Amino acid sequence: GSIIKPLTVAAGLDADAITPQSTYYDAGSIELDTFTIHNFDRRGRGTVSMQEVLNQSLNTGVAHIVDQMGKGTFRQYFLDLKLGSEAGIDLPNEVHGLIGNLDSPRDVEYATASFGQGIALTPIGAVRALATLGNGGHLITPHLVRAIQHEDGSTQPVLYPDGNQVFTAETSEAISRMLVNTVDDALRQGEVALPNYTVAAKTGTAQIADEVQGGYYEDRFLHSFCGYFPVYDAQFLIFLYTVEPQGARYASETLTDPFMELLTFLINYYDLPPDR
């Protein structure tokens, strides 16, 4: 779903294919390989910036970014983010993500992958990739153990190797600013923004694949929400998802409140200092 869009925007920024101020003309849909790709509401917005691509979650916008950077470059970023691999967490029976569509020469496969359709990720695989946006661009292998405390009271830190640099620190800072703007201005029209803390977040509303008939159900969705904070010294990343929620079409309706409740609890519990 659309939580992938920040990764596409970050790749475009990192490849110097776009800037946050870059614009494109949004007609509401594009034609690729005899397929039509629409925005979620099938409306065009005219000339819009990359910031508005995130604010309004425009499918045509991230497809435009792929076109600007080229399919090969886009594919390489997704490979560097290990989206088709296991995340490597120290738990049994982990499975890998599915991005085999990017082996296709068809433009439409890359366009749909840019907004999270036609690919599949595990929650921990998604978290691993999305964490690069807020940690300076490093792809870190997730682990459960930070230290071992012995019976004599001594503590032995468990050290892990640094992750690979996928995005530059400048790209990480730029996409984080954009996602803060999305929360401040667009997420529920800015009503959940916190006055003293920066929060970077993106929602996702993905159609569920119809494994019998092919294609996607029109009325069955997977909602997701990912955010990290405080952005300029990020301490926490929260990833939520729910399968086939009832009574709401979009993830902003179902998962914003749980996210903000968890965020508020963590700020209070760890007494995090304000960052704005």
What are these regions (language model features)?
Residues G1-S2, L7-T242, A251, L272:
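Beta-lactam-recognizing serine transpeptidase/beta-lactamase-like catalytic domain environment
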Residues S154-P157, T256-R276:
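Short, gly/Ser/Thr-rich active-site loops of penicillin-recognizing serine hydrolases
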Residues E244-Q246:
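C-terminal soluble interaction/assembly domains
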